[in-house]
């Protein structure tokens, strides 16, 4: 009996080690907004958050960085989180593009019709707004001296290229264009006008008080995330989405578990299933530890497998 007991104990230990990564996972995809969510106010990933995200990836959860930033600006964060090693994804430009972090394959993409660029430039000039777009590791703009554009370039490690004739210089279909002004009322007025004028052609929204974003029609984080779920064969119930801003509301509502950061506006919190701590208080780590790490249960080991292993122990 003693030898049999030792044999069974040895078998259980062996099989638990063998199956340590085969855990029952309720959630398979973790979608994270970046600025104000993944990053603290110093634009850094905290040690606790980094450790938690590496842990859940080791457990089999795949991570999506979902941001308004350009793809190039998200790559250093993807590398830090080792998304390429764990089958993660980058959802950039607020949903205009999704790439596989492992091999750079574009899984989803929508771009602005270049024929719309002269119209956008005309409206920007008429209102005295700066205008820019992204291209690979550069920003193309008619206003390189603009403080907000310079900050955007620094944040994403991009070079600024000045082009006086913006629409003539942009000889490609951009994922999105940005109009920039400190006149918030004027930006709001153009946003309202364009929502009526461009309905069905382009979508516009303000991501910051000084930024008016122009993207292809029907593009947001949720719609693009839905396309990714189709590619992966996953259900929305298997998704956790975490965000802090108005641009994150649709993906928070789409996810099986939608989480708002503690510093979010009340309107964002109202759409969430759960409110975590702020980005200055490791809110992502708190959410992940509660929703994933503490909820995981070891996979069941079939009795016949246990008995078979016991016979050979």
Regions found by a protein language model. Give the residues of each.
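Hydrophobic packing residues within well-ordered alpha-helices of enzyme cores
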Residues: 49, 74-78, 190, 194, ...
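Short, structured coil segments at secondary-structure junctions
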Residues: 81, 86, 94, 198-200, ...
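Short, Lys/Arg-enriched N-terminal segments with co-localized hydrophobic residues
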Residues: 1-24
